[in-house]
Amino acid sequence: MSLCINPSLIRQYLYCPMAAYYIAAGAPEPPTLRMQRGREIQQEAAQAAAKALGAERAEYSVHITAPPLCGTVDAVLWINGRPSPLEVKAAARPRRIPIHHKAQAAAYIAMVQRAYGRAVATAYIYYAESGQIAQIRMAKDLQELLNYAVSRLQQILQGKPPVLNPNPAKCQNCWYRKWCSHLPTTVEKI
């Protein structure tokens, strides 16, 4: 198992720690139609977001290694002389941006800041289905959540499984539910 933590794994961990565990163990969920659609529209959607945000320039599909984080940012937009990561989601923008989306954006902020050696305070999430953009600012509580998730994922990558905490609303349509159903349930405190 690699000790490099991808921002997508952070998003997954905060949504469901067990799903992140299975992914880290080498059992990723097979691509869904939505995942495939997201890959197909990514470049076009990133270009639309760059234009809408008035980016001076944009770099697409930028791979960054900034231990313990690594991954590919959909785009790095240069706005007012500063780099900002852009994450493209195929879905419509939700009424409230989920915390796991914000934490993924925060991870991209940390990666871009380290890779470019410039202060980065903002990331953007482009929701392609609705054509809306969410601006995510790095705040102290978001940084603390990112640090917590990275710490827990490092433990998972070293072989320590998370505590199972079933959520019927999430588990009902989860591809991994067949593996979790036999595990004992307890509540993990953050």
Curated annotation (Swiss-Prot):
Mn(2+) binds at D74, E87, V88. One of its GO terms (biological process) is defense response to virus. It catalyses: exonucleolytic cleavage in the 5'- to 3'-direction to yield nucleoside 3'-phosphates. Its EC number is 3.1.12.1. [4Fe-4S] cluster binds at C16, C171, C174, C180. InterPro entries: Cas4_exonuclease, CRISPR-assoc_prot_Cas4, Dna2/Cas4_DUF83, PDDEXK-like_dom_sf. Coiled coil: none annotated. Pfam families: Cas_Cas4 (PF01930). Its cofactor is Mg(2+); Mn(2+); Cu(2+); [4Fe-4S] cluster. It is an enzyme of class 3 (hydrolase). The keyword 4Fe-4S applies. The keyword Transferase does not apply. Mg(2+) or Mn(2+) required for ssDNA cleavage activity. Can also utilise Cu(2+). Binds 1 [4Fe-4S] cluster per subunit. It may be important for protein stability, since mutation of the Cys that bind the cofactor leads to a colorless, insoluble protein. One of its GO terms (molecular function) is single-stranded DNA 5'-3' DNA exonuclease activity. Keywords: 4Fe-4S, Antiviral defense, Exonuclease, Hydrolase, Iron, Iron-sulfur, Manganese, Metal-binding, Nuclease. Induction: Slightly induced by 20 J/m2 ultraviolet light. Member of the csa1-cas1/2-cas4 operon. Transmembrane segments: none annotated. CRISPR (clustered regularly interspaced short palindromic repeat) is an adaptive immune system that provides protection against mobile genetic elements (viruses, transposable elements and conjugative plasmids). CRISPR clusters contain sequences complementary to antecedent mobile elements and target invading nucleic acids. CRISPR clusters are transcribed and processed into CRISPR RNA (crRNA). This may be a 5' to 3' ssDNA exonuclease. Belongs to the CRISPR-associated exonuclease Cas4 family. NCBIfam families: cas4. Can form a Cascis complex with Cas1/2 and Csa1. This is CRISPR-associated exonuclease Cas4.
